[in-house]
Amino acid sequence: MDLLYIVAALVIFASLLIAKSKRKPKKNLPPGPPRLPIIGNLHQLGEKPHRAMVELSKTYGPLMSLKLGSVTTVVATSVETVRDVLKTYDLECCSRPYMTYPARITYNLKDLVFSPYDKYWRQVRKLTVVELYTAKRVQSFRHIREEEVASFVRFNKQAASSEETVNLSQKILKMSGSVICRIGFGINLEGSKLENTYQEIIVQAFEVLGSLAAVDYFPVIGTIIDRITGLHAKCEKVFHGIDSFFDQAIQRHIDDPSIKDDIIDLLLKMERGEGSLGEYELTREHTKGILMNILTAGIDTSAQTMTWAMTHLLANPRVMKKLQAEIREKIKNIDEITDDDVEQLDYFKLVLKETFRISPIVPVLVPRVAAKDLKIAGYDVPEKTWIHVNMWAVHMSPSIWKDPETFNPERFIDNQTDFKGLNFELLPFGSGRRMCPGMGMGLAVVHLTLINLLYRFDWKLPNGMKAEELSIEENYGLICVKKLPLEAIPVLTQWT
């Protein structure tokens, strides 16, 4: 008899659930491609997800649904849907989903890029804007930028004297790393624990941070898959390599109090209670988490911007000659380049905009997560849905840009579109609350380096390679890097 009561109760309970589900209005989710069991749509992303998403959007629209393993996602690929995510619903969409390996590398999300939108994030954001990346602080590091660029120029002068081919991808990354290490850590890259491995570590860090980690999409077996593929081991190698470098740099500051006025000095003062992070007490892990963003984002994003700019210039000799003519005519004292000098280089600014457009360093922004149920472009986006913003799709949209695959700086002559977060047709640094706070610092390095390389040297491709033969293919990751290293030969000029 007791069993009958239990069965009857279960039947009634099930009936109520079914009735409730029938009364619940069906959500109008964004359309998307059919999915396979278990893996969903992962197989459709391929090696270049930013391009695959664009192809899928041609069928399923500018806001589409994808199922990536167990994760429900939507992808925004038009300027209208991107504006909705980054502006209209910025507050509701500015948090981050939990991602295992970024959490590991950032000391359990004690950074700015991957941490969720909460009180801690707001305090760290305030710290970076008010203390770390102010115009005054950017200017205070000018001598470091000038010294490292001068060293880079001397290297290229020696190479030019012997007509030696330079691996610009590698050398630009090293120069950028030297600038960031001195600005952020008060330490020369040469002689540090990262001297011989930093390029490998930085590249692998971005591979880990930008990977589709199985552990995040397949909770039950993902860890096993990542151990088999080597992603877990790569993450641990990256973490311990950079952590050891941080320990060295921090200990150097502790042992020598005369090292002042860099970013570690500021953070150590806050650890000692000489500053404020709101209600949070800054610990050593907080310091390292913040430094992680500075090391990785600061080095590689600037380096890749310069590498792509030189790539497109070498592939387009007409643009290269026109830009060099402007720089050599308008720069009166190359040894004293100022922000005012950059302002008068109108064509240089067009070239930089076109580089950001055609080769966005972050093609798909770091995933966001919906904080509540939203209505975007007429579709329902449920709470906890991951949101991918495909900026490459917008930058390469033929409805916005004529001949988008062509490198053409002149397209911006009568186009006032800027890249500082207000024009959603061009967002190399993002927009809204999650916009990159280090834009000014990065641009200062990019401006000074490119102007010197183009003013002082002519450039030619090695082995008789023609401009049209230069590969501009990219590798996908958290940042978009050139698939093949950029190699070129500097040529001495009267300005060298």
Curated annotation (Swiss-Prot):
Binding site residues for heme: 436
Assigned keywords, A-Z: Heme, Iron, Metal-binding, Monooxygenase, Oxidoreductase
- Per the UniProt entry, the Enzyme Commission number(s) are 1.14.-.-
Select a single GO molecular function from the record's annotations and give it. Answer: monooxygenase activity
Provide the coiled-coil residue spans.
none
Q: Which InterPro entries match?
A: Cyt_P450, Cyt_P450_CS, Cyt_P450_E_grp-I, Cyt_P450_sf
Task: List, alphabetically, the CDD domains matched.
Answer: CYP71-like
What is its cofactor?
Answer: heme
Record-linked Pfam families: p450
Q: What family is reported?
A: Belongs to the cytochrome P450 family.
Annotated protein name in UniProt? Cytochrome P450 71B1
Q: Which organism is it from?
A: Thlaspi arvense (Field penny-cress)
